[in-house]
């Protein structure tokens, strides 16, 4: 019983952190909308200021997302480390699948951030999911 209570308390702490992450995602959505307006203005006016602001916003957005993606990948990895020899094959498989998915999302975040930094012409479309 004490083990399950500890596990429940740990899960509740994770949920609290995830709730903060949802708030950050709302901010990311607002920033993305604003970045799109800067991109649109650049396309219509060829304003270098709008272009630079768009690039800076995209770098900021993907930097924050990368931190979030890292959190989830690390959390999934920690779940693997907590597996016990008696855990079911299904539990083991699902924990590894969760880690692989989280790790691939982290890799995509790294790639998108690199694109945002390197793409001076802003002609490569990138988006977070």
Residue spans of the language-model regions?
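Glycine-rich, hydrophobic membrane-spanning regions of integral membrane proteins that mediate transport
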Residues: 1-129
